[in-house]
Amino acid sequence: MKVRHVLACAVALAALAGCNNKTKTGGNAGTPTNDAVTITQANPPPGGTWADVVNETAAGGYMMGNPNAKVKLLEIGSLSCPHCKAFEDEGVPTLINDYVKTGKVSWEFRPFLIHGPVDMAADLIVRCNGLKSFFPLAKALYDDQAIWMGKLEAAAPDKVNAIQNLPPNQAFVQMANLLGLQDWAAARGIPQAKSNQCLTDQKMIDREVQVVSDVNNDYPDFTGTPGFVINGKLVPNVAAWSGLKPALDAAVKE
């Protein structure tokens, strides 16, 4: 989906850090400002594979695979984006089985607020249960995307606008409820009390907004989700597995 910069900034709702424009304010545009990984798991568990290794990145993403892999793939994605769901369905199984499990490729998913408060609510939910749950919850949310996004489409515009005008400590809980995400999370082991905490966690909210700013600054040619970066370089004009695979194969062979 195309970047809607105004909508992404709208999620800031005055109490959040404002979105920057796409002009980098320091350093060289296109050079990632923070690609470090907080390594809590360096090796596969006994009997497991590199796909069982998940670490958090300093840039606000989650990395599956060998943190020291030769090829580092970054997906800039949105949980509400249908093109991102298509990549999840068509590309991710092969990406994991044929690339990540070899230890030669790591895959970072970095959530991007392409649909403002909608993505914020979804992102906070999938982050809520820690590292090990992130990728399974993200996949499950993609699987059910038509259901929860359908609730948004069916909602009265006045109700959606009212939610977006609430303070952040109320807006994302209300948006999650509108989308049915708290019930969805409860069915997957995240009780409402815990999801309430995540949806009102200012530190997590600030981090989500910072991701938008950093992506816009670090990758000025990024135009929409999904976007892909291989070893720090944005892959131009690629938003599907069919286009990404040749670029990934070339990087592995280098």
What do these predicted ranges mean?
Residues 85-172, 220-221:
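Structural alpha/beta surface segment adjacent to cysteine/selenocysteine redox centers
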Residues 17, 145-148, 204-207:
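A short hydrophobic/aromatic micro-motif that marks alpha-helical segments and, especially, helix-coil
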Residues 65-68, 83-88, 113-117, 126-129, ...:
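Extracytoplasmic/periplasmic, Sec-exported soluble proteins
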Residues 49, 166-167, 224-225:
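Secondary-structure junction/capping motif
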Residues 62-66, 141, 145-147, 235-237:
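Surface-exposed, interaction-prone regions with an acidic/low-complexity signature
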Residues 2-9, 14-119, 212, 216, ...:
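Extracytoplasmic thiol/disulfide redox context detector
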Residues 3-6, 20-37, 78, 171-254:
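C-terminal cap of thioredoxin/glutaredoxin-like
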